[in-house]
Amino acid sequence: MASIASATTGIPAAAEPPSHVAGQTIDANISDLDSSDRVIRLRAVRSLGVFGAAASDALRSALDHDDPAVRYLAAEQLGEIGDAPLKAAKPQLEQLAADESSLAVQMAASFALCRAGDLDKHLPLLIATLDYPERGTACSAAALIGKIGPEAKQAVAPLEAVHQQHRAGVKGGDYHRGGAAMNALRKISDKNN
């Protein structure tokens, strides 16, 4: 059984990918990407990320999937895997970050590109989305910034502002937003992220 690189990502640290994730092989998960059941598709794309680099071709293909949630998760998984799989996906991710109709997919692509080192170009979208009117989108932006880690230091001031405006007990604040901002700040300041 492969060791796990991180409890937060679940990406295998060992060069040898696991043979099964959630009881399924990589091929079974790839096949499930075409399921008519959205829950099965989303489980499959999440599981593919755990296979790491061995699933990179399937994750790159999933960036073109009809379902925006599959595209979102594929971009996020590639950002978490990093290395050669992320580098190979950069042209597709750049396209998604620039032209995708789904803001969520733009955010996930921007996250992945930040993990590839393109912070100056792609972190501003995530920072701007911290103030998005829909709570889930704003909280997702904070979570993605947190996953970038210490390299996202230019997001500290905006995250602090969101936390101050939305911390628990602030009248008119949204403690979900404030908590998401605080979690991101913790991850950015964690040198062992």
Question: Where are the regions that the model predicts?
Answer:
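Amphipathic alpha-helical scaffolding segments comprising HEAT/armadillo-like alpha-solenoid repeats
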Residues: 19-32, 53-64, 83-98, 119-131, ...
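Bacterial N-terminal signal peptides
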Residues: 1-6
